[in-house]
Amino acid sequence: MATKSPVNPKVPLVQEPDRDEGGAVVLERRTQKTKPPHMYQVVMLNDDYTPMEFVVVVIQEFFGKDLEAATRIMLKIHLDGKGVCGVYSKDVAATKVDQVLDAANKAGHPLKCISEPVGF
C-alpha cells in the first residue's frame, strides 16, 4: 500500500510583496504595540532616630526635589509614617532605594526605604 505524503498548505504572507523595478521584494512592516513598563513608587518609612534634616537632604540629593518639596515629603513621612519620594521604572526605583539605604547606613541612621508597584 502506497502512502501519500501530506500536502503542506501554503502559508500566506502578511501581505503580498510588492516588487520594484529592480526585482527586489519589499515587505510591509507591521507596527508592534508595546505596553509601558510597570511603575514603582519609592517610599521612605518613618523612624524615631533619623534626623529630619538628613531625610530632607537625601530627598533633595537622590530625588532631585527642591527644599520646599523635600520638606513637604519629609513632613508626610514624619506625620503619616511613610511618604512617596518619586515614581520610576522598576530598575530606577531599585537603584534609588539602594542609594538611600547606602547613604543612611554610611551616616549611621536606621532610615528605611522601599519600592512598591503602583496601581496593583
UniProtKB/Swiss-Prot annotation:
Residues 1-20 are annotated as: Disordered. Gene3D superfamilies: 3.30.1390.10. One of its GO terms (biological process) is proteolysis. It comes from the Bacteria. InterPro entries: ClpS (IPR022935), ClpS_core (IPR003769), Ribosomal_bL12_C/ClpS-like (IPR014719). Pfam families: ClpS. Involved in the modulation of the specificity of the ClpAP-mediated ATP-dependent protein degradation. PANTHER family: ATP-DEPENDENT CLP PROTEASE ADAPTER PROTEIN CLPS, ATP-DEPENDENT CLP PROTEASE ADAPTER PROTEIN CLPS1, CHLOROPLASTIC. Binds to the N-terminal domain of the chaperone ClpA. Belongs to the ClpS family. This is ATP-dependent Clp protease adapter protein ClpS. It comes from Albidiferax ferrireducens (strain ATCC BAA-621 / DSM 15236 / T118). The gene is clpS.
